[in-house]
Protein backbone atom coordinates (compact mmCIF):
# COMPACT_ATOMS: atom_id res chain seq x y z
CA UNK A 1 0.00 0.00 0.00
CA UNK A 2 1.27 3.49 -0.85
CA UNK A 3 0.03 6.98 -0.03
CA UNK A 4 -0.93 7.87 -3.59
CA UNK A 5 -4.46 9.06 -4.23
CA UNK A 6 -6.35 8.17 -7.41
CA UNK A 7 -9.31 10.36 -8.38
CA UNK A 8 -12.16 8.36 -9.90
CA UNK A 9 -15.36 10.06 -11.08
CA UNK A 10 -18.10 8.73 -8.79
CA UNK A 11 -15.70 5.87 -8.09
CA UNK A 12 -16.64 4.37 -11.47
CA UNK A 13 -13.67 5.27 -13.68
CA UNK A 14 -12.49 1.76 -14.52
CA UNK A 15 -9.08 2.86 -15.81
CA UNK A 16 -8.27 4.87 -12.70
CA UNK A 17 -9.59 2.08 -10.50
CA UNK A 18 -7.42 -0.52 -12.25
CA UNK A 19 -4.36 1.70 -11.95
CA UNK A 20 -5.02 2.15 -8.24
CA UNK A 21 -5.25 -1.61 -7.77
CA UNK A 22 -2.05 -2.18 -9.75
CA UNK A 23 -0.09 0.31 -7.67
CA UNK A 24 -1.62 -0.34 -4.27
CA UNK A 25 -3.04 3.18 -4.10
CA UNK A 26 -6.25 4.60 -2.70
CA UNK A 27 -9.33 5.55 -4.77
CA UNK A 28 -11.31 8.67 -3.88
CA UNK A 29 -14.36 10.08 -5.64
CA UNK A 30 -13.25 13.09 -7.70
CA UNK A 31 -16.04 15.24 -6.26
CA UNK A 32 -14.98 14.49 -2.67
CA UNK A 33 -11.36 15.57 -2.96
CA UNK A 34 -9.66 18.94 -3.33
CA UNK A 35 -6.03 18.30 -4.26
CA UNK A 36 -5.15 21.92 -3.44
CA UNK A 37 -5.66 21.12 0.26
CA UNK A 38 -3.54 17.97 0.23
CA UNK A 39 0.20 17.41 0.44
CA UNK A 40 -0.17 13.85 -0.89
CA UNK A 41 1.03 13.08 -4.42
CA UNK A 42 -1.91 12.36 -6.70
CA UNK A 43 -2.70 10.78 -10.05
CA UNK A 44 -5.03 12.55 -12.44
CA UNK A 45 -6.75 10.75 -15.32
CA UNK A 46 -4.25 10.45 -18.13
CA UNK A 47 -1.51 9.11 -15.85
CA UNK A 48 0.20 12.40 -15.10
CA UNK A 49 1.87 12.98 -11.75
CA UNK A 50 0.66 16.15 -9.99
CA UNK A 51 -0.24 17.96 -13.19
CA UNK A 52 -2.68 18.07 -16.10
CA UNK A 53 -0.24 17.16 -18.86
CA UNK A 54 3.30 15.81 -19.29
CA UNK A 55 5.12 19.10 -19.82
CA UNK A 56 8.67 18.21 -18.73
CA UNK A 57 10.51 15.74 -20.94
CA UNK A 58 12.00 12.57 -19.51
CA UNK A 59 14.58 10.70 -21.58
CA UNK A 60 12.94 7.46 -22.69
CA UNK A 61 13.74 4.61 -25.09
CA UNK A 62 11.79 4.54 -28.35
CA UNK A 63 10.22 1.07 -28.06
CA UNK A 64 6.74 2.25 -27.09
CA UNK A 65 6.66 5.02 -29.68
CA UNK A 66 7.76 2.68 -32.47
CA UNK A 67 4.89 0.33 -31.61
CA UNK A 68 2.42 3.18 -32.14
CA UNK A 69 3.69 3.64 -35.72
CA UNK A 70 2.88 7.36 -35.71
CA UNK A 71 4.77 9.22 -38.46
CA UNK A 72 6.68 12.41 -37.66
CA UNK A 73 6.44 14.73 -40.65
CA UNK A 74 8.98 17.24 -41.90
CA UNK A 75 8.20 20.88 -41.19
CA UNK A 76 5.68 22.42 -43.57
CA UNK A 77 6.45 26.07 -44.32
CA UNK A 78 4.97 28.74 -46.54
CA UNK A 79 1.42 28.89 -45.18
CA UNK A 80 -0.28 32.22 -44.64
CA UNK A 81 -2.95 31.82 -41.94
CA UNK A 82 -2.71 31.52 -38.18
CA UNK A 83 -5.00 28.80 -36.88
CA UNK A 84 -6.28 29.16 -33.32
CA UNK A 85 -7.51 25.85 -31.93
CA UNK A 86 -10.21 26.83 -29.47
CA UNK A 87 -9.81 24.77 -26.29
CA UNK A 88 -12.44 23.10 -24.16
CA UNK A 89 -14.10 25.26 -21.54
CA UNK A 90 -13.32 22.92 -18.62
CA UNK A 91 -9.54 23.44 -18.46
CA UNK A 92 -10.05 27.17 -18.86
CA UNK A 93 -12.23 27.20 -15.75
CA UNK A 94 -9.63 25.13 -13.92
CA UNK A 95 -7.15 27.97 -14.48
CA UNK A 96 -9.75 30.59 -13.60
CA UNK A 97 -10.09 31.87 -17.18
CA UNK A 98 -13.10 32.64 -19.34
CA UNK A 99 -12.83 31.01 -22.76
CA UNK A 100 -14.22 33.91 -24.79
CA UNK A 101 -12.04 36.44 -22.97
CA UNK A 102 -8.95 34.31 -23.54
CA UNK A 103 -9.77 33.96 -27.21
CA UNK A 104 -10.22 37.70 -27.75
CA UNK A 105 -7.08 38.56 -25.79
CA UNK A 106 -5.12 36.01 -27.82
CA UNK A 107 -6.38 37.43 -31.10
CA UNK A 108 -5.57 40.97 -29.97
CA UNK A 109 -2.05 39.92 -28.95
CA UNK A 110 -1.39 38.16 -32.26
CA UNK A 111 -2.52 41.25 -34.18
CA UNK A 112 0.17 43.29 -32.42
CA UNK A 113 2.85 41.23 -34.15
CA UNK A 114 1.42 40.24 -37.52
CA UNK A 115 -1.16 41.13 -40.13
CA UNK A 116 -1.68 37.52 -41.15
CA UNK A 117 -5.29 36.32 -41.36
CA UNK A 118 -6.49 34.53 -38.23
CA UNK A 119 -8.85 31.57 -38.33
CA UNK A 120 -10.52 30.09 -35.26
CA UNK A 121 -11.17 26.36 -35.24
CA UNK A 122 -14.13 25.65 -32.98
CA UNK A 123 -13.83 22.61 -30.77
CA UNK A 124 -16.48 20.14 -31.88
CA UNK A 125 -17.65 18.03 -28.93
CA UNK A 126 -18.03 14.87 -30.99
CA UNK A 127 -14.67 13.09 -31.22
CA UNK A 128 -15.87 11.31 -34.37
CA UNK A 129 -16.60 14.64 -36.00
CA UNK A 130 -13.18 16.01 -34.99
CA UNK A 131 -11.19 13.00 -36.15
CA UNK A 132 -13.08 11.82 -39.23
CA UNK A 133 -15.34 14.43 -40.79
CA UNK A 134 -13.52 17.67 -39.97
CA UNK A 135 -9.94 16.77 -39.17
CA UNK A 136 -7.20 18.96 -37.82
CA UNK A 137 -4.91 17.83 -40.63
CA UNK A 138 -7.36 19.16 -43.21
CA UNK A 139 -7.50 22.49 -41.38
CA UNK A 140 -3.71 22.70 -41.14
CA UNK A 141 -3.21 21.91 -44.80
CA UNK A 142 -5.46 24.83 -45.73
CA UNK A 143 -2.66 27.42 -46.01
CA UNK A 144 -1.71 27.52 -42.30
CA UNK A 145 1.48 29.20 -41.05
CA UNK A 146 1.23 27.96 -37.44
CA UNK A 147 -1.21 26.82 -34.78
CA UNK A 148 -2.02 28.60 -31.51
CA UNK A 149 -3.88 27.06 -28.60
CA UNK A 150 -4.18 27.01 -24.82
CA UNK A 151 -3.92 23.39 -23.69
CA UNK A 152 -5.58 21.55 -26.58
CA UNK A 153 -3.96 18.35 -27.80
CA UNK A 154 -4.14 19.89 -31.27
CA UNK A 155 -0.65 21.32 -30.71
CA UNK A 156 0.76 17.83 -30.18
CA UNK A 157 -0.92 16.62 -33.37
CA UNK A 158 0.19 19.70 -35.29
CA UNK A 159 3.87 19.31 -34.37
CA UNK A 160 3.84 15.63 -35.31
CA UNK A 161 2.21 16.60 -38.61
CA UNK A 162 4.85 19.24 -39.32
CA UNK A 163 3.29 22.54 -38.24
CA UNK A 164 4.91 24.81 -35.62
CA UNK A 165 2.71 25.66 -32.67
CA UNK A 166 2.28 28.02 -29.75
CA UNK A 167 0.97 26.65 -26.43
CA UNK A 168 -0.24 29.20 -23.90
CA UNK A 169 -1.35 27.16 -20.89
CA UNK A 170 0.90 26.90 -17.80
CA UNK A 171 1.49 23.24 -18.62
CA UNK A 172 1.21 21.46 -21.97
CA UNK A 173 2.40 18.12 -23.29
CA UNK A 174 3.89 19.89 -26.31
CA UNK A 175 5.73 22.61 -24.36
CA UNK A 176 9.22 21.21 -25.12
CA UNK A 177 8.62 21.51 -28.88
CA UNK A 178 6.48 24.65 -29.08
CA UNK A 179 6.82 28.34 -28.32
CA UNK A 180 4.93 30.18 -25.59
CA UNK A 181 5.78 33.68 -26.84
CA UNK A 182 3.29 35.16 -29.31
CA UNK A 183 5.68 37.99 -30.13
CA UNK A 184 7.55 35.32 -32.13
CA UNK A 185 4.48 34.50 -34.25
CA UNK A 186 6.32 35.39 -37.47
CA UNK A 187 9.31 33.24 -36.54
CA UNK A 188 7.90 30.15 -34.82
CA UNK A 189 10.00 27.48 -33.16
CA UNK A 190 11.03 24.63 -35.47
CA UNK A 191 12.71 22.09 -33.15
CA UNK A 192 15.14 19.71 -34.82
CA UNK A 193 14.20 16.13 -35.64
CA UNK A 194 16.13 14.65 -32.74
CA UNK A 195 14.27 16.77 -30.20
CA UNK A 196 10.87 15.99 -31.73
CA UNK A 197 11.65 12.27 -31.73
CA UNK A 198 12.84 12.31 -28.11
CA UNK A 199 9.70 14.21 -27.15
CA UNK A 200 7.46 11.70 -28.94
CA UNK A 201 9.20 8.83 -27.15
CA UNK A 202 8.65 10.63 -23.85
CA UNK A 203 4.92 11.01 -24.54
CA UNK A 204 4.58 7.35 -25.50
CA UNK A 205 5.74 6.43 -22.01
CA UNK A 206 2.63 8.10 -20.59
CA UNK A 207 0.20 5.92 -22.56
CA UNK A 208 -0.68 2.54 -21.11
CA UNK A 209 -2.64 -0.55 -22.04
CA UNK A 210 -5.29 -1.51 -19.48
CA UNK A 211 -3.29 -4.61 -18.58
CA UNK A 212 -0.37 -2.36 -17.61
CA UNK A 213 -2.67 -0.41 -15.32
CA UNK A 214 -3.75 -3.60 -13.57
CA UNK A 215 -0.41 -5.38 -13.26
CA UNK A 216 1.54 -2.43 -11.87
CA UNK A 217 3.66 -1.74 -14.97
CA UNK A 218 2.20 1.75 -15.36
CA UNK A 219 2.99 2.53 -11.74
CA UNK A 220 6.56 1.32 -12.14
CA UNK A 221 7.17 3.35 -15.31
CA UNK A 222 5.62 6.46 -13.81
CA UNK A 223 8.07 6.34 -10.92
CA UNK A 224 11.24 5.57 -12.89
Q: Which role fits each region the language model picked out?
A:
Residues 77-127:
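Conserved catalytic-core segment of nucleotide-activated headgroup transferases in glycan assembly
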Residues 162-180:
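Gly/Pro- and small hydrophobic-enriched strand-loop and loop-to-helix capping segments
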Residues 2-3, 81, 145-146:
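Structural motif
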Residues 36-79, 175-224:
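Leloir-type glycosyltransferase catalytic cores
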Residues 2, 28-31, 121, 150, ...:
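Generic beta-sheet signal
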Residues 111-166:
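Donor nucleotide-activated moiety binding/catalytic core segment of transferases
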Residues 10-12, 33-35, 87-91, 124-127, ...:
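Short, solvent-exposed loop/turn segments at secondary-structure junctions
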Residues 1-47, 134-138, 154-155:
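Active-site and donor-binding regions of nucleotide-sugar-utilizing enzymes
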